[in-house]
Amino acid sequence: MKRNTIDIITLGCSKNLVDSEKLMRQLEANGYKVTHDSDKPQGEIAVINTCGFIGDAKEESINMILEFCQAKEEGKLKKLYVMGCLSERYLKELALEIPQVDKFYGKFNWNELLADLGKAYKSEFAIERTLTTPHHYAYLKISEGCARKCSYCAIPIITGRHISRPMEEIIDEVKLLVSEGVKEFQIIAQELTYYGVDLYKSQKLPELIERIANVPGVEWIRLHYAYPAHFPEELFRVMREHDNVCKYMDIALQHISDNMLNKMRRHVSKAETYELIEKFRREVPGIHLRTTLMVGHPGETEEDFEELKEFVKKVRFDRMGAFAYSEEEGTFAAKEYEDSISHEVKQQRLDELMALQQEIAGELSQTKIGKEFKVIIDRKEGDYYIGRTQFDSPEVDPEVLIKADEEYLKIGEFYKVKITAADDFDLYASIL
């Protein structure tokens, strides 16, 4: 047990990771040594930043809390604090059920946590953070909360209304990160396309991305978690005109059947969805689309599911994730619909959909053999350097593997490669 050391454990999404990184910087500014995501307690104090999005995430968070409670009982830890989405939503219940935790905090109560440690929040470090990612890329969160009211989603209940960060503050953070060696930015929010509506009374995502693209030293910008309804089409021009805005869009579509889109309260139709995809591919040639789909939402019939499969076959997404509906208390779906689709049927549909996507992904990967791409090197792993193209986001997308015995490559640098082989997800390449 190291004195004056705090372990930060982050669960859930990249937005949570940014929160942890900002907290880490505050703790370091207050004199602590901070470790991140260690397998076992190293310091006197641990802070677990939880996720509470769906059932599996809640279970993972609870298990991690209990694991650290055990470590505390064994004398390996003096203090245990819990924050984040799960804690925000179930603070009172958790405090009663798990008294071994010294204190539970909401998602945004950093000041309180620091005060309990006898420290103070330092506003001069507000846009600074301690990166936990490789030094060449960072996640850039442009807003908090969500203004949408999708039937199944508890995020607005947990995080509250959409709050855009001021544009100047974001640009200052980008410049600071570039000065520290960051070249690649993953732009994230619960819902990107709403950015600016609350603060500037209109959608400002295209303007923001263009301003980030114009910052010297920004080499790649990638956009995550867009919403299909009222998509700001000015963004197409920005993507076309700026080479450092990756031809990549992560847009959660959830379903295609009008029956399900209505039940999900998505405020977009099947026809509008197809039209938007067509516009993406027409206006931004070569764009790679990532989406997330949901199966098993209350009311999903076999016909709805077949329609979803046909959609996946027809559109042939470059990247796709999917998950099964999980009832979340307090949501519209939990109040108004019966969760009548069995776990077995949900899992069967999920497996079927992902098997279909795996086949499509494999076919799309094969078309890249013989082509040349610019890649950034993330790490060395065994006999390979691991890199990504502009079409691949860290953690969730395919990677490019380059034999390490070819030549010495620098982590965080760009190289031109030629694809020599492919499997269902990853590509193999040689340096040009």
Please identify what each model-predicted range represents.
Residues 1-195, 234, 249, 271-282, ...:
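Proteins enriched for Cys/Gly/acidic motifs involved in redox and nucleic-acid/cofactor modification
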Residues 6, 45-46, 138, 185, ...:
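Conserved beta-strand core positions
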Residues 79-84, 89, 94, 179-303, ...:
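Conserved SAM/AdoMet-binding glycine-rich loop
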Residues 111, 148, 193, 258-259, ...:
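Glycine-centered loop/turn positions within well-structured domains
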Residues 170, 187, 223, 251, ...:
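Conserved, mostly hydrophobic/aromatic
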Residues 189, 225, 253-255, 291-295, ...:
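Active-site proximal loops enriched in glycine and acidic residues that flank catalytic Cys/His/Asp
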Residues 333-432:
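Terminal RNA-binding accessory module
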